[in-house]
Amino acid sequence: MVTGPRFSMPATKSQFIPQKSIQVFLDGFCFYTPQHWEFIPFKNLPTDTQGFLEETFKKYFGNQPPSIIHFEHPALFVPQALFENSKKEDYYTHYNTLAEAFELNVLDTEDKTLKVVAPIASKWKSFFKKMHANIDIINYQNLLYNLVQSHSKTQTSKQLFVHLQNGAFDLFLFDGANLLFNNRFAQNNVDTFLYFLFYVVETLKLDQDAFDLYFLGKYDSYNAYYDGVSNFHNNLQYLFVDDQKNTTPAPAPFFCSH
């Protein structure tokens, strides 16, 4: 049982998470600025999809291009020294199925130690590039890695970071600046989340007194998740606690708050 949550804040969140973005999920878009966010399901898009999205784009961002952040499928992290671009599909398909109509985008982590092989929907890549040639196309896990690595490299104990989103959660385990483990797991309730979380902890033989567990952000919609972990782990902390309240949680709330 934690005696009380500790809150920590490395640098500033806006150094790592864009303040204006279009977040692409399997079932829709989330348009985000610090003042407002709106989730638009694909099933609600009108017949004139292009015209509607261009109008929504201008309403939120004017002539300033946002970042396009892809959440549809998990990315694969490959050590820079071992990476060969011609083998990116082989790397990825050994990790996860490459869905039809998706292509692989290769990015660098900020510390230049890893290549991030990330699937993006070809349709939306082409669409947004037509809207603005210089638009940034990013995978959300690359952004998360950069943020949590910047924090963990200053710590002496192992750090396990948890990012919660609709239908899934991400884990990153660091020892100092070095990534030891990462993965994304499906979840739709607290029990499933706790099962996978503690399966990983046991598989990696992590002594609870030897690592700190961080949630990214702290949101009312996930209180049951925090409570569930606090019953089993003593070093529970939160990074970038957001004071904004919203009765309807965003699909990935950590990316919709600054």
Could you describe each region identified by the protein language model?
Residues 1-258:
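Hydrophobic/aromatic-enriched cytosolic interaction surfaces used to assemble or bind macromolecules
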